[in-house]
Amino acid sequence: MKYRSAGVNVGVGTDGAASNNDLDMFEAMRQAAFLHKLVTGDPRVVSAQQALSMATIGGARALGMQDRLGSLEAGKLADVIAIRTDQPRQVPMYDPVSHLVYTTHGDDVVLTIVNGQVLMRDGVVKTLNEAQVIKDARAAADQVRKAVQ
């Protein structure tokens, strides 16, 4: 991570389904840590804590929004999630941050609060019809495919 050592902010995010077919931030954090370990041959490079920081405050800095989000602090937007920790892959949990980065998946999220508003509770989206959104997305994708053929 020579760029981080030089003081360059590094953020982790998803580019969208068009680039990697996955919108899972946990997978993005995991890959950020694993790929740097692979490239450098150093298992200590990009720790779980560093990957989490890159995905939270690092992402907020990349967007120029570190004063409003990216960390849990008074005066910032109340954007939080709760995850299930009763999955076999998460037991025993010695280091919560390590487990968050290396074993958690997007479908482990059971509660999502954005700016203080509950968007999902018990894995059910409360603010929109998820089935309809999926149906509309598939229809739009079909239209794009037909248009480019």
Language model: regions and residue ranges:
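Active-site microenvironment of metallo-dependent hydrolases
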Residues: 53-149
